[in-house]
Every structure is written in C-alpha cells, then in structure tokens.
A protein has these predicted regions:
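Surface-facing alpha-helical segments and adjacent helix-coil boundary elements at the starts of domains
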Residues: 1-239
C-alpha cells in the first residue's frame, strides 16, 4: 500500500476532488477521495487535515451524504474523515452529529471504529459542550449495543486527557461507576479506559468515591483500572 506523508500531496488530491465535484458531481468527488486517500496509507493527522479542508467547500447540506458514502466503504480512513467532519459540525448540529456518529459506530461494528469516531465526536463534544453532552451520554448508557456503551468510556478518556474540568470529570466518573458491572470485554475496555484516565488526572475524585469503588458489586476489572490510573499519577508526580 502506497504511503502518503505530504500535506502538499493531500492538497493536490483535494484540489482534484474539488474540480471533479464541480464538473461531474458528488460521485466523482467520492471516487477521487476513495482512490487518492482511502486506498493509501495516510496518517490520521493528515486525514483530519483533509476533512477540515473538505468541509470548507462541501456545502453543509451535502456533507452528511458525502460522509455516509465514505463510511460505507468500511475503509479505516473513512471513519477519521467522517469523525472530523462531524466534529466540525458540533457547534451547530450537536445532537445530530452525535446521533450520526453513533450510527457509524454501530454500523462499523469494530473496536477501532468506536474509538476513532467516539474520540473525535462524542469525546470532543464532551470536552467543548459538557453541559449539553453529558445528558446525551447518560441516555446512551442505557443502550444495549456494546459499542455505544463502550464509547462513553472512550469519550471520557479523550475529554479528561484534553483537560475536561474536574466538575464534569466527576460527573462522568459517576456514570462510569454505574457501568462497572459490565461483563462484555469491549465495554469493559472502554469504560475502564475512561476510569483509568480520571484516576490518573484526578485522584481526588477517586478518593471521594472510594467506598463505592470498594463495594462487592463493583467488579474487580474496574478497580484494577483505577489502581493503574492512580499508579500512573504517582509516576507522573515523581518525574
């Protein structure tokens, strides 16, 4: 597989895609993106750059269609492009973007789809619009789909790592703690990831919930992730 490392080359492909779109329509644009980017080895940062550039000239009312077709290819890079474009739509279309992200996550049916889209859409929404996003995440926690529940932990990891305020980090910890009885391995990894990150960056939150964490009802896998996070906090402080 050809590897692409140049932003200049990405710009050239995008310019070709734009010209094809203007002259022949959306289908021609999608062919250029598929052949020029998705079938090549392109880093996630370069794909995010491409998504930002595309969002500048693809009209808002056509963007969802373009994302749907790209994601339908099931190429890993398509989820980065779609995730980034949905992220850019969050200020105006927060709920719609989260709903579409969840549809991509369920349809993708792979852990990496959950993590790629979850971080870029739900995680960024939590970081930038916590008061609006947290109620949506609480609602998603009731879903039966394992990927939707997993993405709550993924979103928490992303937002806390990016400096989500302690107030909202604590709210998210309570939500993760309520999911600590999970038995599915994919859910456990996502929820545990979020809990571990909170423990690393906000050990005081963990101490406030120590009694609940130590209850028999709280599974050992959850407590183990907390311990790992606290140990990483100690290591970071010692450096």
């Amino acid at each position: 597989m050809e590897k692409m490392t140049s932003k200049v080359r990405v710009r050239e492909i995008l310019e070709q895609a734009k010209q094809s779109w203007e002259q022949q329509g959306q289908d021609a644009l999608l062919v250029v993106i598929f052949e020029g980017l998705l079938k090549k080895k392109v880093s996630f940062p370069l794909l995010e750059f491409a998504a930002k550039e595309m969002a500048l000239w693809i009209p808002e009312d056509e963007q969802l269609y373009v994302m749907d077709i790209l994601v339908a290819t099931k190429e890993m890079g398509s989820y980065v492009l779609a995730g980034m474009m949905l992220q850019l739509r969050l200020p105006l279309y927060l709920e719609e973007s989260i709903q579409r992200a969840c549809a991509y996550i369920v349809g993708g049916d792979q852990w990496y789809v959950c993590d790629i889209v979850g971080e870029r859409v739900l995680g960024h929404a939590l970081l930038t619009y916590p008061e609006k996003t947290i109620p949506l995440l609480k609602h998603l926690a009731q879903y039966s789909d394992k990927w939707i529940v997993r993405t709550i932990g993924v979103a928490t990891h992303y937002a806390v790592k990016k400096d989500l305020s302690p107030k909202f980090a604590e709210t998210m910890f309570r939500l993760l703690l309520s999911l600590s009885d999970a038995t599915d391995s994919h859910i456990k990894k996502g929820i545990g990831w979020g809990a571990k990150t909170i423990a690393k960056f906000h050990p005081a939150i963990i101490e406030r919930y120590r009694k609940q964490i130590d209850l028999r009802e709280t599974k050992q896998w959850f407590r183990t992730k907390i311990t790992i996070g606290l140990n990483r906090n100690k290591v970071a402080k010692s450096l």
